[in-house]
Amino acid sequence: NGKTYTMTQHGFARDMEFTLDSQTQDTLWFSIVSNETTMENYPFTFRLEVGYQLKGTEVTVLWNVINTDTKEMYFSIGAHPAFFASMTLEDGPDTDHIHVGDNIEGTFTCYRVTENAMALEDDTLVLPRDLPLTADLFSRDAIISKDDQASRLALAYPDGQEYVVMQFDEPIFGLWSPTSDAPFVCLEPWHGRCDADDFTGTLQERAYERMLEVGGVFNGVYTIGLPLE
């Protein structure tokens, strides 16, 4: 509509209070809907439903994004779950690893980011799929994958035994920890990401932005498993 809107880091949904819609022994569904406050930062009416389904040692997270507006709706959605993990100063026999993909041989490609968390699309980085969790890994902030590099991420002990496994259908993912001594690392499946450092376009032109027709519903899912339990 030609108007400029501002938004906080990671969007507004995480700052809203969700309503519990339904609850069973193994499933919870929550929701939020657009209101006057969201319209100040995001010019669409919508409903967002988030479900959690527990089965054994796995939890599946489901997203339903519903366009309740009278026009096409553009959006991004992603997750930011954190898991306890320890980092070492350098790669060694006591170093945990991140496994990227089903086959951890080879490499994957990701974007570097600027100090203000913008993607440098002309400055990519190639990293091993068996990625040591060392103190300098996030010295340049988050690691942001390029398209369809993996649909599975895992945290593994030094002997290679995985203790957290995430499977997802999102096209890109992020890896992040705030400091070298933080006791956790985030595995983040995304539909959408930060803008490129030189991006000046519209919402419709953003990389990885999703579009919903009037009345349309978008479904997303990811699963977290604890294979050692």
Regions inferred by a protein language model and the residue ranges of each:
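Active-site/ligand-binding surface loops and adjacent short beta/alpha elements
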Residues: 72, 82-168
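Short, acidic/polar linear motifs in exposed loop/turn regions
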Residues: 69-70, 228
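Extended, loop-rich substrate-binding clefts of extracytoplasmic carbohydrate-active enzymes
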Residues: 4-56
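Asparagine-centered strand-capping/turn motif at beta-strand->loop junctions
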Residues: 63-69, 177-178
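Histidine-centered catalytic micro-motifs
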Residues: 12, 76-84
